[in-house]
């Protein structure tokens, strides 16, 4: 089916373009959401009359989206989840979880605006894209951690694979081993390796 796009649609075309799409995509998505009109002679005339109004609305929506984009550009949300010692999550962080985290901070974003290829399944800082308007995308980060303290460590760039207590214990063990090891010691004859 041929349709006339009333707004920019990702991976399809710009406003005003005449594009051929599958019938189901047009009937179930583009037409009901007001993103396109069937490409009939009457609708082509209708589009020409609506063109200036549509462009003005698009410019206003883009300006509003730019304000939201400026507010959230580089924003970091924290999601707390249970995870194994290796950093694998018990479950995953989905688009819904990210939207909930944004809403908790007072930023209203719909699930369809979050561009996430696959759910997040590991602890760490993950970069994602948010499409606040078909022509305006902004990068944000999602920090997934076991606790708020761990999230702060991740955001500071610290390595969370080893815990601070483990590092202190290792340093003490090395110091204790140094007390028992004499670098100037000479091997006794009894301790000489046997040559064969």
Curated annotation (Swiss-Prot):
Claim: rRNA-binding is one of the keywords in the record: yes
Single GO MF annotation: rRNA binding
The entry's keywords: Ribonucleoprotein, Ribosomal protein, RNA-binding, rRNA-binding
InterPro entries: Ribosomal_bL9 (IPR000244), Ribosomal_bL9/RNase_H1_N (IPR009027), Ribosomal_bL9_bac/chp (IPR020594), Ribosomal_bL9_C (IPR020069), Ribosomal_bL9_C_sf (IPR036791), Ribosomal_bL9_N (IPR020070), Ribosomal_bL9_N_sf (IPR036935)
Record's keyword annotation contains Flavoprotein: no
PROSITE patterns (UniProt xref): RIBOSOMAL_L9 (PS00651)
GO biological process: translation
GO cellular component: ribonucleoprotein complex; ribosome
Role played: Binds to the 23S rRNA.
Family according to the record: Belongs to the bacterial ribosomal protein bL9 family.
NCBIfam families associated with the record: L9
This protein's name: Large ribosomal subunit protein bL9
Organism: Rhodopseudomonas palustris (strain HaA2)
Phylogenetic classification of the source organism: Bacteria, Pseudomonadati, Pseudomonadota, Alphaproteobacteria, Hyphomicrobiales
